[in-house]
Structures are given as C-alpha cells and as structure tokens.
Amino acid sequence: MDGFYPTNLKNAVIYAALILILLFVYGIFGSIYIMHLGVIDAIYYTITTVTTTGFGDIRPITPSQKLFTASLELIGAGFLLYIFTLMLSVMFMSFSEYVTGAKLKRKIASMKNHFILCGFGRVGSTAFKELKKRKQKVVIIEKNKDLVETELWSDPNIIAIPGDATKENVLRYAGIERAKCIIIATGSDVDNLFITIEAKELNPKIWIVARASERENISRLKKAGANRIISPEFSGGKDIYFAAMEPLMMKITVKHGMESIKREAEIIFKHNCTLENIMYHLPEFREPLKRKIEVSDLDHIEKFLFQVKKNPRLRESLNKMYESTSGVHSHWISGPSKENLEKVVEDLKKEGILLGVNLDDEKIKEITRKYGMLAEVMVKPEITVVNKHGIDEIRDEAEIILKHGCTIEDIEYYIPGFREPLKRHVGADSIEDIDKFLNTLKKDPKKYDAIDRLYMLSGGGIHSHVISARSLESLNKVEKELKEKGFLIGVNMSLGEIKEMIQKSGTVVDILVQHDVKNLEDKKTVVKYGGRILTSKHYLPGIRYVLTRKLNLKTMEDVKKCEKELEKPRARRTLTALYELSANIHSHTIVTPSAEITKKIEEELKEKGILLGVNFPEEKIWEMVEKEAVEPFCVD
C-alpha cells in the first residue's frame, strides 16, 4: 500500500534543493566576478565558505569582497540550520507515520463485518454520517491525502486510508475479505467499475452498492457485480446508505398501546439496532402514515415521551392514532448483523407484541381490518368506493360525493383479460368539473362511445373511485347515500374481490356461436333483452389468427344497419369468406344488465341451435374450428 507521506514534507525537500542550487550559483558567480577567482577556485571557495570550514588560503581584501563573503557565510549558516531542522522533521514524521500506520493497521485488522466507503465527497460523506449515526463500523478510502490528513485523521474515531481504491492492496488493507458491504461513491464511473470488479473478486459474498453518474453505466455496474446502483442525479447519500443497509434491515409489525412504547424501544436498542421509522396502518387508508425516527438510543425515546406527557394536545393526537389502529403499527429497523435482528424478533415474541416480520401490505391490511377501529385523526382521510352504474348516471354519483365536500381522486375500470385495472386521474372537487367533462362527451360521439364501452366492459358499469375528505363523517355520509341510491357495491375492496364479483355477476360474457353470414338471430336476441354486443371474433385456422371486429350493437336500429351492410356486394363477399374460413364459428363479447338476463339469452340461443358455449378458453375454440374447417386458411 502507498506510504503515508504528507505533501508539505515533500515540498520542504524540494524547496531545500532549490535553495542549495541558488546558493551555489550565487557563490560561484560572486567568487568569479567579485573575488576574481578561476572556476575551480570559485567552486572551492563557495563550498568552504558556505560550510564555514575556510582554511584562510583565499582572503577577501576589498570592501565588496568582504561583504560578499559575509553574505555567503550568513546564507550558508541559515541553510545548514534549515537542513538540520528538516532532518529532525523527517525523522520525527517517519516515526510518527510508522506509529500511525501501525495503529491504523491494527485497528483495521481487528475489524470484521464492517463497511468500506470508497470516496468521501458529497455523496460519500452523507452516507458516512448515516452509518455513524447507527454506530456502524466504517473504513474510509479516499484518494485526496490532504483531506485524510487534515480533516479525517483529526477525529480519532474515524478510520481513513489515503489511497486508490482501484488497487487490490488498498482494498486488502481495508479488510475487504472480512467486510460485509462496500459503498463505492467516487465521482468517476470508470473507477467505480474497477472497484466493483476488484471487490467481487476479493470477496464474492460482499454486498456492493455503487454510484453511477451516467445512466448508461448502470447496466455495466450491474453486470460487474454491484447489488444496488444509486445515481446522484435522482438520489443522494441517504439512498446509498439505505441501499447498503438493505441486507441488514427488517420490517416488524407489532401491536401494543402507548404504555409499551419505551419497552419496545428498549428491546430494539439492547441489540444495537436502529429504529428507522414508524408506520401507522389505519383501516380506512390506502397507504400507511409514515414518520421518520432514525434513533438508536433510549434518550431520544425518553425525551419524546416526556414531551407527550407535558403536551396534552400531542398526547391526545397520539392516543387517537393508537386507538384508531388498536396499536397495530410497523417499523423498519436496521442492525449490525442478521443475528442482532433475529434476537430482536425473539425478544419481541417473548414480550407478546410481535405480529409478523416483513409482512406485505395486503397481509398488514388484513390484520388492520381485524383489529382496527375508526377514529378521527388530524389527517386527510380517504376511502375507495366500488360502484356500479351506467354512463348516464355519472352526474348523480358525483353529486352525492361532491356535496359533502369530498374530492373524486381517480377512477378505475376492471376489464376482463387485463391483470391490472385501467386507472385515470380525475381530481374533481366541484360539480362544474363533472359538467365540463359530460359536455365534452356530448360534443364528441366517439369519446362518448369509448367511455360507454369501458363502462360496459367493466362488469356492466362496475368501477371504483378513491375519494378523499376533510373528515371521516363526510366519508360515512357519502357511503350511506351511495348505498341508498343503489350505486355502492363495497368499500376498500381488494382487486381480487372486485374481479371475483364481476365474474360472478355474469354481466360480461363471451358467447361462442355457429351460423351462416345471413343469420342475425344471435344479435337480435341479445339486443332484445337489453344487452349489448361489443365485439365479434373470427378464428382463422392454419395461421391461428383471431380477427376482432368492433360492433357496439345496442339497439334494433344497429342490427338493421348490419342487415343493410350485408346487402352491399363487397361487404357480403368479405364477410362470407370470413365466416366460411372459420367454419361459421365466431364469438361475441356481450354485456347484459344482470346475470338473469344473460341466462335468458343463453337459453334462447340454445333453442335456436346456434349457441356452442359460454366463456370457452381459446384453445378449446381452436380445436372446434380446426376440427370443422374444410380448408384451413393459409398464406403461401
């Protein structure tokens, strides 16, 4: 590893050499031009005068010669004193550096499961502060020797190495084989890449967090072995810290009252862990309320509890928060090792307050619904309402929500075949916003049809809104009136519950039929019962291609338009070919007002001999088509 030689010592040696050269130039030229000596005698006279060892064989006679000789002797004596002082400094600093280096080496050799931080710039120094706050052991490697010697070494609690982290011997000196994590935060992506490769080779199990200044280098660092890559463009030192601590963090979900706050903290701090935050899981809220804590000693908790005791308003607010969740809340905690975290879990279990470890949001919501009670808290509450109505009743629904001072935040449609709902931001807090939207629909028939189709596809008008309000009372009133109006299906339902309900409702189904192109009985039957045909799908064998036609038939007038369309020769030829290629088998996606009506449509189509089945899987449809198709459709 590079030696620890201060820059000012090197400068002193350079200055001494320059002074010596200038002194000799002055002495030699003065001896030639003032003492009138030859070159050899001038060199001899300069050396003997500067070193004060003159033998008296050459003596100054004139005043100018005497002044020159005196100045040369004075400068020489000063220079010799400077050289003597410099030698003492070198000896002292060499001894000091030996002692410092030995101490540093012993300290690092005794460390294990520590962090190595490469680079102590803006990002690195912030990450270091977060690590020290949590009492983590850190070795810093910094290229800038001045920074290490003047700033970092001034604090006896900081272990820092002046050196290049891209070099193997420097990483070994920092104890890379025994470290649990290396944070690579230098300003050079090239250096960061080399350090990542070197670190992975020296310790394949080490957790690597690397900084990437350029977006295109993120994938390179990932391939090189970095577990997490942080870009200062989007994040900072704190994010690097949390990425570094990821393997040593755990989410605990607990249940206890205010009286057990101190006891819970004692258990966590006893094992040298840090309380990073607290999350309150209110039953009526989509996301938990989060608050940073970032403490690792009991003094902070005791100060907080003293403030709670002293301040009635704070005590009342906190008490309501605990009441509203029945004491259910979560913490992210970090620790020096997995063993420490496991000990915390064991002790919390013994205390009888632990509900689970690293539970996902859905699981915590289940627990919250089980234990949680509604209570007014000093935040803006929100709920998700699942409603069912047609496009013509949008204003009626909005009036109920908005008249109680609530805001419609968004709308979600649940389309069959889609894993996630289609979500659209609304942000309406006045009826004028709704009227403006409805006027746009009236002026634009295409937009109206598109929204109408969405409503029909989404379980015949089933959709959800997140609505927010100033108080829970307002939300309760909205819930009650939506229920009375017949719009409300449920509150805060999960995606699985909504999809299951749509499936059971039987209002959106795919019917598989078989008939020739002139037969429109399937269309007439669906429309007659108030249903709607959204699409028609034809299955072309050979290439196994599904051709989908948008129909959107909702009245007998629409069916008559289909009949007129068939009278046109080109349209008739195209549709006839399509029907024949798929053996007259095709499917329709239909929407009906209720499951009962869907059943009636199915029964009538069966009687007419054209219904093959409902909601068949596509593979089964292909089997039927390919079995019946006389000439498979193919392209040369």
From Swiss-Prot:
What is its subcellular localisation?
Cell membrane
**Gene Ontology MF annotations:** small molecule binding
Sorted keywords for this record are: Cell membrane, Membrane, Transmembrane, Transmembrane helix
Q: Gene3D superfamilies, alphabetically?
A: 1.10.287.70, 3H domain (3.30.1340.20), NAD(P)-binding Rossmann-like Domain (3.40.50.720)
Q: Which GO terms describe its cellular component?
A: plasma membrane
Q: Where is the RCK N-terminal domain?
A: 112-231
> Could you list the residue ranges that cross the membrane?
12-32, 34-54, 75-95
Q: Which InterPro entries match?
A: 3H_dom_sf, 3H_domain, K_chnl_dom, NAD(P)-bd_dom_sf, RCK_N, Trk_Ktr_HKT_K-transport
Top-level lineage group: Archaea
Q: Is the Repressor keyword given for this protein?
A: no
Q: Which GO terms describe its biological process?
A: potassium ion transport
Q: PANTHER family this protein is in?
A: POTASSIUM CHANNEL PROTEIN 2-RELATED-RELATED (PTHR43833), POTASSIUM CHANNEL PROTEIN YUGO-RELATED (PTHR43833:SF9)
Q: What is this protein called?
A: Uncharacterized protein Mfer_0534
